[in-house]
């Protein structure tokens, strides 16, 4: 019995390897919706121009893609896609702002550190400039406060003592506050016994006259 001929298998393989007709090829069209240009896969042809394309099956209206003329829509597609994604995601926008702020802060800190350590920087010269020494003289002023004497008040008077007007020719009695003189010579004699002080002779009174003595 003869083996079957492999003609059907070879025919199927050839059909798969043959290129598809023009109308069966899918093309990437640039469909414009306002400012945004979206890529769209057309099963037939892309008709129109580089900026605004649509799907059609007419070969005469097919747009001829030229790299020099149709390069701008691709750039606009990427730009518009990036802008739309950035605007629609507030978290990404906030993260971008934080990243920019942190970067600027780090750059500022590094700049200050470099300027403070480098001798050719103006900030280093400003920080290392010697400060002028200011000498201050302190003067001490002494003020003399006048001594205030306590006010003198009259002392209490002795109620039992009355001043007596001295009589002419009579000795004045010593005041109690006057110190007494040294003791008389006859008071300090041998034996230590003090003699009584004789009474003083009364002063002479011209009005008093002795009676005349009788003559024998």
From Swiss-Prot:
Listed PANTHER family: PROTEIN SHISA-5, SHISA
GO biological process, one term: apoptotic process
Residue numbers on the Cytoplasmic membrane side: 115-216
Free-text note on domains in this protein's UniProt record: The proline-rich region is required for endoplasmic reticulum localization.
Transmembrane segments: 94-114
Subcellular localization(s) per the UniProt record: Endoplasmic reticulum membrane; Nucleus membrane
InterPro entries, A to Z: Shisa, Shisa_N
Protein function: Can induce apoptosis in a caspase-dependent manner and plays a role in p53/TP53-dependent apoptosis.
Cleaved signal peptide residues: 1-26
GO cellular component: endoplasmic reticulum; endoplasmic reticulum membrane; nuclear membrane
Coiled-coil stretches noted in the UniProt entry, renumbered to this chain: none
Membrane topology, record value: Single-pass type I membrane protein
The keyword Transcription belongs to this UniProt entry's keyword annotation: no
Protein name: Protein shisa-5
Family of the protein in this entry: Belongs to the shisa family.
Positions on the Extracellular side per record topology: 27-93
Record note on quaternary structure: Interacts with PDCD6; PDCD6 can stabilize SHISA5.
């Amino acid at each position: 019995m003869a083996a079957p001929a492999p003609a059907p298998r070879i025919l199927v393989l050839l059909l798969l390897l043959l290129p598809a007709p023009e109308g069966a090829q899918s093309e990437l069209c640039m469909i414009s919706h306002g400012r945004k240009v979206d890529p769209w896969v057309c099963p037939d042809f892309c008709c129109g121009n580089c900026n605004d394309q649509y799907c059609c099956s007419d070969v005469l209206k097919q747009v001829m893609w030229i790299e020099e003329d149709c390069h701008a829509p691709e750039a606009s597609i990427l730009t518009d896609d990036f802008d739309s994604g950035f605007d629609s995601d507030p978290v990404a926008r906030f993260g971008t702002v934080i990243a920019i702020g942190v970067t600027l802060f780090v750059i500022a800190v590094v700049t200050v550190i470099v300027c403070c350590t480098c001798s050719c920087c103006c900030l280093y010269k400003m920080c290392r400039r010697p400060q002028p020494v200011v000498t201050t003289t302190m003067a001490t002023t002494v003020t003399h406060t006048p001594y205030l004497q306590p006010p003198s008040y009259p002392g209490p008077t002795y109620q039992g003592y009355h001043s007596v007007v001295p009589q002419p020719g009579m000795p004045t009695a010593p005041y109690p506050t006057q110190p007494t003189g040294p003791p008389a010579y006859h008071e300090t004699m041998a034996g230590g016994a003090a003699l009584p002080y004789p009474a003083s002779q009364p002063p002479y009174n011209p009005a008093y006259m002795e009676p005349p003595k009788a003559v024998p």
